[in-house]
Amino acid sequence: MTMSSFLINSNYVEPKFPPCEEYSQNNYIPSQSPEYYERPRDPGFHHEALYPQSNYPEPTYSFNNVQGTGNQDMSQRGHVQSQASLQNHIPRQNQLCEVVPVATPALCSQNAKNPTAQKGTLSKEPIVYPWMKKIHVTTVNPNYTGGEPKRSRTAYTRQQVLELEKEFHFNRYLTRRRRIEIAHTLCLSERQVKIWFQNRRMKWKKDHKLPNTKMRSASSSSSTSQQTQVSSQGPQPDGSAPNSSSL
């Protein structure tokens, strides 16, 4: 009652739509066939106009005949389908086999004869030019062939220098056994310990203004050679002794 009274008393106006003809003229609604508006039918329904009735009489069927014919039809269909599937698969396999390239004996023989060429094509070694090599010389030597570079200087740590100074304070010359022990203790090579002690001895002699040991040994060897020459000459005929200044 409330809804009906509301609709009667209210100023509600029903919407007015244009007729379908205007929509069809403006191509809003496509024209449909009369079958479009008919009731839906079962899928088993056959229209008389589409499927005309045949004139020959329909044969009678029994349950056994229907079952036997059905089995035969199914077997025939399955046989036909299996043959069709086999025929479809066989050309595909043939196509796949044809696509795969086959290595000819000529190519195999070439690869066997030239394994180095095949490796070169796979991985090329980087080219090192002469200007890329490090040269530790003051002037450019044209005859330099890029041999072993100059050894870099060893950077001793403070702990290593302290231990070497302690050892030098007690022993300026090391035996081979002691040198090996120090090298193992300080994680250095025997050569590095030997060079450090040589440089430290040179510095100590320079600080104490002592003559170089090598220069002293050279001068002593020259004096001994002179003495041997004088003694080998013997006395002169006039009986005078040889003068050292004349020699």
UniProtKB/Swiss-Prot annotation:
Residues 217-233 have a biased composition (Low complexity). Residues 149-208 bind DNA. It is found in: Nucleus. Residues 206-247 are annotated as: Disordered. GO terms for cellular component: nucleoplasm. GO terms for molecular function: DNA-binding transcription factor activity, RNA polymerase II-specific; RNA polymerase II cis-regulatory region sequence-specific DNA binding. GO terms for biological process: anterior/posterior pattern specification; embryonic skeletal system morphogenesis; positive regulation of transcription by RNA polymerase II. InterPro entries: Antp_homeobox_Deformed_sf, HD, HD_metazoa, Homeobox_antennapedia, Homeobox_Antennapedia_CS, Homeobox_CS, Homeodomain-like_sf. Pfam families: Homeodomain (PF00046). Keywords: Developmental protein, DNA-binding, Homeobox, Nucleus, Transcription, Transcription regulation. A motif (Antp-type hexapeptide) lies at residues 128-133. Sequence-specific transcription factor which is part of a developmental regulatory system that provides cells with specific positional identities on the anterior-posterior axis. PANTHER family: HOMEOBOX PROTEIN HOX-A4 (PTHR45771:SF2), HOMEOTIC PROTEIN DEFORMED (PTHR45771). Belongs to the Antp homeobox family. Deformed subfamily. This is Homeobox protein Hox-A4. It comes from Heterodontus francisci. The lineage of its organism: Eukaryota, Metazoa, Chordata, Craniata, Vertebrata.
